[in-house]
Structures are given as C-alpha cells and as structure tokens.
Amino acid sequence: MYGADLPADQQLEFSHRYILGVYDLYDRLTKAFPDVLFESCASGGGRFDLGMMYYAPQAWCSDDTDAVERIKIQDGTSYGYTPSMWGAHVSAVPNDQVGRLTSIDMRAKVAYFGAFGYELDVTELSDEEQATIKQQVAFYKQYRKLFQFGTFYRLETPDTSDNVYGWETVSHDKQTAIGMRYQILNGANPAYIRYYFKGLDPERRYTVNDGSEVFSGAELMNAGYFVPRVMNRLQSPKVPSDFHADMFIVKAVD
C-alpha cells in the first residue's frame, strides 16, 4: 500500500492516515444515523480493535465460519473483547473455507456466544433443518442478553483437556448460567466427564437442564456436574460423534 499524493519520505504515514480516514468516515456515519448499529469487518484484516469498537461496537470475527475453527477464533477473541462484540453466524456445510461437515446443532452452539445469526440459503435446507432453525432462533432470543452481556468464563481448552473447549456465561444476579462443552474429536471408551462451573453463588441451589436433581453452587463449581456419555454402540446407537457440543442451562431454585 502506498499513497500517490505522498512524497517518498512520507509513505510510512499512509496506513496511519488511512485509519484516521476510516475513523472520520465512521464518525460522520454514526452522527448522521445514531440509531443504526454498525458492524466492522473483519479481524482477519486487522480491523477488530478498540478504535473501531468506539464507532462500531460489533465486529465480524473472521470469514472462517467453520464451527471447529470458530471455537478457536472466538476463544482467542474473548481475551480482549466481550461476546456482544463478536459477529458469530451459522453457515452452510460443507464449510466454504475448510470443507468440514458439522451438525447444525454444533454450529449454533458455537455461534450462540456472540451476535448470533445465519449466513446460508434456507431454501436449500431440509424441512427438519428449517424447523431446527426456528427453535434455535427462539432459544437465542430467550437467552440473548445472557449470552451477550453475562460474565464470560473460559473453562477448558486443549491445553488443559484433550480435544475440549469449555465456555460459560453467568447472569450478573447469578440466577442463570449457560455452559457449553465442545468435544472436537471423539475417542473410544472415554473417561467419566465432569463439567466444572464458575461464577455461581456457592450458597444457592440450582437445577441443570430442568432436571429434578438439585445442586448447590459450591457443588457444581468444586465437584462438578457429571456429563452422561454413551461409551459405545453396545450401550446405544447414539454414540456422540466428532464435533459434538453439550449445553448445560443452570437455573437457581431459591
């Protein structure tokens, strides 16, 4: 990149001047249209920064929309920015970037953590998938504020747990939390799985996924929640495959 109007000894100013020009344009746009939410694009182009967030408080994380890739991308983004800033969508499969096939359930459970949406041709989906999308949209609308503005926790990464990422968001009053456990690759006869929550009220009692069993917050954080898992097809034909996500909705009962 270079500036045709700049002399040779000022060419290093070009990129800086360009960004100042972008800020100036955004300033005029946001003043002219104060009720419009602008989204900047994209972190792959180095435009996911605090200066851009001043004008466009939502950014497209990456053109890489594969669910597995997006777990890593959004996990890294979480170190600097809150989920309300992440543009996160369910896209078509096979994925355009990596050709991977993931379930619409997995894709949605990754995209829930962020400014949720879809970028695919719904007319190419089966009736079952279209019905699933309606359910996903209704679910996200119910918990949108929690996903975008709750307290976000990173619970597991491949550095601490094989092939696994774990995220959680907790409401500020600690009444509700949603945890997600992403299994990238499955393995034979996995060990017993416990999901350890964070940020709950240790004195309160909670249910998980509207179950009948009641747990204290201290128990869920220190002893963990047992995740039922089919070990092999002799137990059930529904063995979790690769690219699987478990979701835990936690609600206070007192």
Predicted feature descriptions by range:
Residues 1-23:
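Aromatic- and acidic-residue-enriched carbohydrate-binding clefts of CAZyme catalytic domains
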Residues 16-123:
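Glycan-recognition surfaces
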Residues 158-202:
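Carbohydrate-binding surface patches
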Residues 40-49, 126-130, 153-161:
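A glycine-rich phosphate-binding loop feature that marks nucleotide/adenosyl-phosphate handling sites
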Residues 217-254:
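C-terminal beta-strand-rich structural cap/linker in extracellular carbohydrate-active enzymes
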Residues 38, 111, 179, 208, ...:
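Hydrophobic, well-ordered secondary-structure elements that form the walls
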Residues 198-213:
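Solvent-exposed beta-hairpin/edge-strand motifs
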